[in-house]
Amino acid sequence: MSNFSPREIVSELDRFIIGQNDAKRAVAIALRNRWRRQQLEGQMREEVMPKNILMIGPTGVGKTEISRRLAKLAGAPFVKVEATKFTEVGYVGRDVEQIVRDLVEVAITLVREKRRDDVKAKAHLNAEERVLDALVGKTASPATRDSFRKKLRNGEMDDKEIEIEVADTGSGPSFEIPGMPGANIGVMNLSDMLGKAMGGRTKTRKTTVKDSYPILINDESDKLLDQDQIVQEALRVTEDEGIVFIDEIDKIASREGGMGAGVSREGVQRDLLPLVEGTTVATKYGPVKTDHVLFIASGAFHVSKPSDLLPELQGRLPIRVELNALTREDFRRILTETEASLIKQYIALMETEEVKLEITDDAIDALADIAVDLNATVENIGARRLQTVMERVLDEISYTAPDKTGATFVIDAAYVKDKIGSLAKNTDLSRFIL
């Protein structure tokens, strides 16, 4: 687990997300507290629980992005789920325990990738031997193998086609065991059970020497790895470092005096309670305790209020962070300052057609103004509005770019207003188009 200080975490998030300092600070402290807990010994380590976070703010201001970037930064298993996808146990649909099962799958992939890196050098040598076997046969003399090995390493054989045998990882037939809890835990994979007994199935693939290396290195890495050890490590990582982001939590809040669908909504909240508080979930790899998994919930709370959530669930989300609606200046900074801003993306996309795109400062001001106006008059969808506006402005250039190789387009405020001004003024039209 990374041991960035809260200040470093915030400055890393600043590269991708504009503003929202309170939210960044809250998640930075939460992440640092995970690291602090890892340094504790024995009983105290067990007692320290993560402080779960509730983010409140309109759509498109960076709630999901903050969590996504945080998980990348931490190198921790992370799943993002929509609260609306789940139903109360007993109804048709996914139950909330599936969240933990998904988290374990993510952790296994993470741990396997890390372990593969550790054995990469050895796996590379083994892969080279298998390529030589395919080229000259297993019975070739050492001298022949050495001469071919030199050619291989010089890249002379890259385009030669060879046949290689690799492990067959096809899912094979699987069946559901009736009466087992959860959606996936009861699915036993027959090929998993029989594969070990039969010594593993292989299949032959035709490929070039160059393309065969990644496949063979993965195959050889997996042979060098202890799968049971990976699973045990993944279960530990899930329990100690897992992060779950629950989006749209306001949609399962029962409105005051609301009837009808409220029952199953409240049911989802009730099912979430033990998960957030700490329970043991059965997965096909073994039981997972959720006591130390960090939960970050977020919602716009347009119609409902945080106080409409079940009181017990509110108590289990002790840190409240409010995210602000974006201002004109924020839009400007989103277009210019972020690491992979929309403007940089469009310039890079046009460069693939050998078309140069220049966007002036007054054009950026005009784009920000239009985005703010539309959010105020039509519907506030936050930073996502910029994508709609940019796409509309660059529509003509994107369409004709292949025919204009070598051309340079300068986009200024007049161009932006010409393309979008009339639509933005006509509220009825912009409701449908922008």
UniProtKB/Swiss-Prot annotation:
One of its GO terms (cellular component) is HslUV protease complex. GO terms for biological process: protein unfolding; proteolysis involved in protein catabolic process. It is found in: Cytoplasm. Its main location: cytoplasm. Keywords: ATP-binding, Chaperone, Cytoplasm, Nucleotide-binding, Stress response. GO terms for molecular function: ATP binding; ATP hydrolysis activity; peptidase activity; proteasome-activating activity. InterPro entries: AAA+_ATPase, ATP-dep_Clp_protease_ClpX, ATPase_AAA_core, Clp_ATPase_C, HslU, P-loop_NTPase. ATP binds at I18, G60, V61, G62, K63, T64, E65, D247, E312, R384. CDD domains: RecA-like_HslU. The keyword Cytoplasm applies. It holds the Pfam family AAA. ATPase subunit of a proteasome-like degradation complex; this subunit has chaperone activity. The binding of ATP and its subsequent hydrolysis by HslU are essential for unfolding of protein substrates subsequently hydrolyzed by HslV. HslU recognizes the N-terminal part of its protein substrates and unfolds these before they are guided to HslV for hydrolysis. PANTHER family: ATP-DEPENDENT CLP PROTEASE ATP-BINDING SUBUNIT CLPX-LIKE, MITOCHONDRIAL-RELATED, ATP-DEPENDENT PROTEASE ATPASE SUBUNIT HSLU. HAMAP family: HslU. Belongs to the ClpX chaperone family. HslU subfamily. A double ring-shaped homohexamer of HslV is capped on each side by a ring-shaped HslU homohexamer. The assembly of the HslU/HslV complex is dependent on binding of ATP. This is ATP-dependent protease ATPase subunit HslU. It comes from Brucella anthropi (strain ATCC 49188 / DSM 6882 / CCUG 24695 / JCM 21032 / LMG 3331 / NBRC 15819 / NCTC 12168 / Alc 37). The gene is hslU.
